[in-house]
Structure formats: structure tokens, C-alpha cells
């Protein structure tokens, strides 16, 4: 068994990796703090603890770290010191401080009082130095130090070895830039999701999205949308001469719809039904089972990870918004979906009286919404049955032509916003290919207000809300994948909402391995 590995529910956006510390940049107003970058993530470090070239472990922002690891390294904050390995020592210091408080409540001279206060404060300060800064939930959150954002957590091999001694034997170079979420067979890190507020729903638990389709024997072929990985961790996949499409990442809720083959039950004789029950119950003579269905094309739709058609998924409820926004969106496009065609899109605006994403109206009035298709797949016309993945520009052209032919859809269907189509070498000609091209191009994109409006307000919204970010896809990519780059201002706002315990449907659906969503 590998000491560092990936679990079945591994998510690249919420994991750990071994990295080499890059350039340390001074931070104005501080003699001992410095800024470095892990991919696109800014992180603040102490110059006396972290040096350029060090090999360290990095935990992504908004992760939840293993409680035993935090305890072994005394990383829980003073408010939950009982979770730390040195809890007894900290308790003794706090009790000593409390005894000073008791003495202060008695009659004492001014000199004695000052001495007791100093002694009390020393005990409290010492107790605090023996604790960390993680809250009880072990969440890695974005903070600002000297106005510099710090996203993620760096820790050493020695720290991890306190939790898992076997780590002492690994060669860090062998794992450089490798992602993992499991240490020696135990889940070490996962996405942090605050306690979910109750919504009207019913149904079962999530597993991997595409695996869940198998439970619905009426669907013959269906694919949920793949996870969009972080560009920072995949920038090495992009070559300077790759033709890429960079589009606006909008903040809504996912919808998947397609006209796919489904099995529709048909009536058969009683004795045939009886025989089929025997076959199904005992799992024998499967080849002699009577056919009790017809195969037809039907429109099926889902959220990011849950089939929504009630005749297929009988346990599905109205969902997070108490209103089937996914059906409403599908009804708009259903008449124009061809056989074996699947459309992946984003729904933005309002679900009746509820904003789909708080603060992100995208120009919609209350009760209004629109669908933005961003991905389409069909079958190749060579008879092979192979899936054909459309390029982003083809998706945009299809949407624009649809609206042109059916102008009544103009308010309900919006084409994807493409910021750039071409090579990154042409976009950033001043970035030398021979000198750390990937790292430097990533930095250019992170700060590109001219082409992408990074860190700016989203002009599509009436409210003052920051742009979420951008999505990059390689044209004619043999792999179905896309990469996202989120704005720091958006991430900071998202972190503030998580602090309040506000969880949107995308977070529930995408990051709760065992969450529910109907």
C-alpha cells in the first residue's frame, strides 16, 4: 500500500500535495513574513521557518484536515485546546492563570495586584503559544496578513510524521507535485462543508455521480459533467502553441439535459412477469428473462449529480430551491435537443423568489432566470457510436443560431461568453517560453483585468459582486476536461459565506461525498 494515495472520492481542488517552495517575496511592513505562490494560491510564511527550495506539504484552501494530525501537532486553537496532544500542559497553565484571578478578587495591595496580573497574563500567553490556530472543525481558510492573502496551509515532513511515523521513510522528491488525500490508508483531508441548513428534500446518499446512474435501469446511457479541475494544478498540461478557449465562469447551478435512450416498461403476460421475478430474485437464467420494456428516446435531466425525472428517480424531491428549476430550464431547450445529444449548462438568476446564488442576479429580475450552455456532446456520424465532444466555440455558435432562429428564447437562453480563442503564447508574447513559462503565464492570467476582468466586479450583475473567474479548455482535446481559475476576491467572499454556515447547492452536490441533494 502506498503511504500517500487517493481515495475513491478524491477531489483535486481539495487535497494535499508535495511542493517545492518558490521565490519568497518581502511583505511591506513586516520583517519576518514573506509571500510565495503555490500555483495560483498566495500563501504567507515565516522567513525563519520556510526557505526557497524547501520540499513541504501543502493543503488546499477550504480543506478539512484530519483531527489526529492536528492533535499530534497541537494545532487546535486555545478555544478547543482539549483536542491537542498537550492538553494537560495547557490546562495546567490556564488553571494557574485562574488561580491568579482568584487572588486578584481578594484584598491586595496595588503592587501585589500588578504582579498577579502580570503573572496571569504570562500564563495565558504561554498557554496560547502551545496551541495552534485551527478551529474545532479543522478547516483551512483564507486569511489576510499585512493585507496579503494567504490561502492554504504548509507543513513539514516532520509534522506529518508525528501523525504517521511511516512518512519518515518516504523520499519527498519521489512525490513532488503529486496530489493525495489519504495517508497510510486513512483519509487525511477532504473538502470542508459547514453544517447544512435543512431544506425540503427526501432521498438517499451520494456516491460517485456516474455510478449512481446504474441504479436507474431505465436509463441506457447518461453522463454527468466531469469535475472542473484547478488550472493552477494542471497548467503543465497546456503548451504554448495549444489553441485554447477561455470563457467566463458564471456562478449559478448546474443542469444536464439530454435526449437519450431509455427503457420504457411494457405490459407482458402474468406468467412472464412471474418468471422475471424469479430471475431477478435468484439471479439465475438471466439470458431467458422475458423482455418487458421498449427502447425509446426521451429527454432526461439532472442537477450536477442527481437525476431529476420523477418517473426515473422516484425519490427525487423539489430540491434545494423548493422549486424544480432544472425542469424549468430543460423545458426551454427540450424541443431543440437532438437524439444522443447532451447539453451541460449553468442556470443563473432566480428560482421563483430565491436567488440561485446569493448576490449574483446576472441582470435577472426576481422570478427570472436564463440557461447558458457551456458543453455539448453528440455521437459521431460514422456509425461507431463514439461520443463527440464539441469545442466551446461550436457550443456558442449552436446557442447563437438557436436564439437567432427562435428570438422568443433571447431572454431565456444566453450563449457562453468567450474572452479569448487562440494560443497563450500569442496572448502573452512577452512571457519567454524558455524561462518558467507555465508559472509566469499563470501569474499573468491571475492578474489579467484587460482580457478577463480578473478581480473586478461582474458587469453582468446588477449587484456589486465579484467575477467568479474563468474556464480554459483546449480545442480538440482528446480528453474531456476543463480547468478553472477563480478570482481571489470571489474566494474571499465565498469564505465569508462559509464562515456564516451558508452553503449553496453546488457545494452540497459537488463536495459532500455523502451529502444529499434532490
Question: Over which residues does each language-model region extend?
Answer:
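Core nucleotide-handling region used for phosphoryl-transfer chemistry
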Residues: 2-518
Amino acid at each position: 500500500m502506498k503511504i500517500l494515495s487517493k481515495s475513491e472520492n478524491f477531489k483535486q481542488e481539495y487535497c494535499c500535495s508535495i511542493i517545492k517552495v518558490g521565490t519568497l517575496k518581502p511583505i511591506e511592513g513586516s520583517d519576518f513574513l514573506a509571500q510565495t505562490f503555490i500555483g495560483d494560491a498566495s500563501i504567507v510564511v515565516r522567513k525563519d521557518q520556510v526557505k526557497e527550495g524547501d520540499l513541504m506539504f501543502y493543503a488546499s484552501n477550504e480543506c478539512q484536515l484530519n483531527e489526529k494530525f492536528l492533535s499530534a501537532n497541537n494545532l487546535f486553537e486555545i478555544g478547543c485546546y482539549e483536542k491537542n496532544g498537550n492538553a494537560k500542559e495547557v490546562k495546567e497553565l490556564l488553571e494557574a492563570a485562574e488561580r491568579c484571578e482568584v487572588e486578584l478578587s481578594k484584598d491586595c495591595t496595588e503592587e501585589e495586584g500588578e504582579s498577579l496580573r502580570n503573572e496571569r497574563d504570562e500564563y495565558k500567553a504561554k498557554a496560547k503559544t502551545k496551541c495552534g490556530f485551527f478551529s474545532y472543525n479543522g478547516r483551512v481558510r483564507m486569511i489576510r496578513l499585512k493585507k496579503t492573502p494567504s490561502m492554504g496551509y504548509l507543513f513539514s515532513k516532520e509534522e506529518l510524521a508525528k501523525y504517521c511515523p511511516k512518512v519518515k521513510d518516504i523520499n519527498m522528491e519521489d512525490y513532488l507535485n503529486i496530489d493525495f488525500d489519504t495517508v497510510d490508508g486513512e483519509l487525511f483531508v477532504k473538502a470542508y462543508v459547514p453544517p447544512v441548513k435543512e431544506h425540503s428534500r427526501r432521498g438517499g446518499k451520494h456516491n460517485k455521480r456516474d455510478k449512481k446512474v446504474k441504479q436507474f435501469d431505465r436509463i441506457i446511457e447518461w453522463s454527468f459533467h466531469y469535475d472542473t479541475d484547478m488550472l493552477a494544478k494542471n497548467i503543465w498540461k497546456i503548451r504554448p502553441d495549444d489553441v485554447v478557449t477561455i470563457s467566463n465562469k458564471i456562478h449559478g447551478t448546474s443542469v444536464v439535459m439530454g435526449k437519450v435512450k431509455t427503457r420504457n416498461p411494457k405490459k407482458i403476460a402474468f406468467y412472464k412477469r412471474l418468471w422475471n421475478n424469479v430471475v431477478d430474485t435468484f439471479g439465475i437464467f438471466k439470458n431467458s428473462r422475458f423482455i418487458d420494456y421498449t427502447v425509446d428516446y426521451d429527454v432526461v435531466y439532472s442537477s450536477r449529480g442527481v437525476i431529476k425525472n420523477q418517473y426515473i428517480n422516484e425519490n427525487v424531491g423539489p430540491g434545494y430551491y423548493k422549486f424544480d428549476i432544472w425542469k424549468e430550464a430543460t423545458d426551454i431547450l427540450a424541443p431543440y435537443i437532438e437524439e444522443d445529444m447532451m447539453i451541460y449548462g449553468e442556470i443563473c438568476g432566480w428560482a421563483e423568489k430565491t436567488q440561485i446564488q446569493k448576490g449574483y442576479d446576472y441582470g435577472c429580475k426576481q422570478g427570472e432566470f436564463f440557461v447558458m450552455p457551456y458543453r455539448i456532446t453528440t455521437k459521431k456520424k460514422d456509425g461507431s457510436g463514439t461520443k463527440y465532444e464539441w469545442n466551446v466555440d461550436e457550443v456558442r455558435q449552436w446557442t447563437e443560431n438557436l436564439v437567432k432562429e427562435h428570438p422568443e428564447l433571447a431572454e431565456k437562453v444566453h450563449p457562453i461568453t468567450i474572452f479569448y480563442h487562440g494560443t497563450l503564447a500569442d496572448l502573452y508574447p512577452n512571457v519567454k517560453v524558455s524561462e518558467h513559462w507555465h508559472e509566469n503565464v499563470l501569474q499573468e492570467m491571475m492578474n489579467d483585468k484587460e482580457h478577463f476582468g480578473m478581480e473586478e466586479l461582474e458587469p453582468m450583475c446588477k449587484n456589486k459582486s465579484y467575477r467568479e473567474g474563468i474556464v480554459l479548455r483546449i480545442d480538440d482535446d482528446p480528453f474531456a476536461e476543463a480547468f478553472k481559475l477563480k478570482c481571489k476576491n470571489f474566494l474571499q467572499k465565498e469564505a465569508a459565506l462559509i464562515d456564516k454556515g451558508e452553503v449553496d447547492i453546488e457545494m452540497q452536490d459537488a463536495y459532500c461525498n455523502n451529502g444529499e441533494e434532490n
